[in-house]
């Protein structure tokens, strides 16, 4: 079977003439098939350039005709333009075209009008669906790769909510973004309406309902901690201005990862003040690491442990609070129904392990980022988003990085991880919890580091001087 593709500028007279000839051949020859593509004059040249680059062809006029040896989408063999197609029809089929110049021009204008009508119809149909626009920054990362299938599963936003995923990263990562896009489409998820790629900053976050900020790339070697901190400010300033300009009025912005999570959240709040209350930092990754360490010690599964609280700097100096932590389904002489729980600290008899080894191991994981890979980052972000949309489990404490308003004696104006619950599409700080007082020394240590990070990032402090004190449980 001879399968041809005819593509051209919608207002091109020669496309109109080639189209008439192709229609005649398809009608009269049983094994001749034609697929037609029109492009608006404003985008034709760029579309043709991309097509030729992809297929390694050399062609710069309208129309362009190629033959596909397989069904549409198979390997293409360039035939050429109108003249080459006419010559091919004469030699192989003994058919030519006698269309007049006047008729060519008239049909070309009709083609342009039809093309514009079809495009407007497509846009109106898209408007009827109105999917949730989800934007992911640093989208070439491993965390994004693991995040996409969770977002498209229907577990986060609900099985009835259609989403459009927008992958945003720099131009150098375009090949990896294309790979992520193709794999996402291969999932064939009923919740996924479309996947798009964005490498132009000015186009980022248009109509965004959800924005996920992942760890940014480090393109050059950074010699000092201060330089590393300062390097976050320009990107957060760019993101903040784009969010203010392009995002939906009630967009949810969630910051995840393993480096300067609180700092990036605070900077985004500064540069996108309209959305400050809707910007949060994910702490569930660190919370999960703490639960896993406890579970290994108690020889149970991590999901049996609830209400571990992470205070302070999610990716820096923090305080893992076990005073409210509970264990469910623990095998011992005492058993109860599924809702029966026991305090974690009552089952950990090795206080030396709790106060030393447990603390040091978690501090090392936080400081180095080890074992905080793409899978953990993706799961903690997705779970936090699910809670934000549908509420956290009743009675369960969730750790979250939010802007302090002075709760628990925390200094105002810093992003601090603290206990919250999610309900009715928002989060509420659990200020009524009892026995959650934090010693002045621990509070000073955590707050001091967060304040210094912000001052260094904004250029108001030259050197970062971490608070010298041991981490205590």
Swiss-Prot record:
SUPFAM superfamilies: LDH C-terminal domain-like, NAD(P)-binding Rossmann-fold domains
EC category name: oxidoreductase
E.C. number(s) listed in UniProt: 1.1.1.-
Family matches, as Pfam families: Ldh_1_C
Keywords: NAD, Oxidoreductase, Tricarboxylic acid cycle
Gene Ontology terms, MF aspect: L-malate dehydrogenase (NAD+) activity
InterPro entries linked: Lactate/malate_DH_C, Lactate_DH/Glyco_Ohase_4_C, Malate_DH_type2, NAD(P)-bd_dom_sf
Entry annotated with the keyword Transcription: no
Biological processes per GO annotation: malate metabolic process; NADH metabolic process; oxaloacetate metabolic process; tricarboxylic acid cycle
Keyword Oxidoreductase on entry: yes
Recorded family membership: Belongs to the LDH/MDH superfamily. MDH type 2 family.
Official protein name in the record: Putative malate dehydrogenase 1B
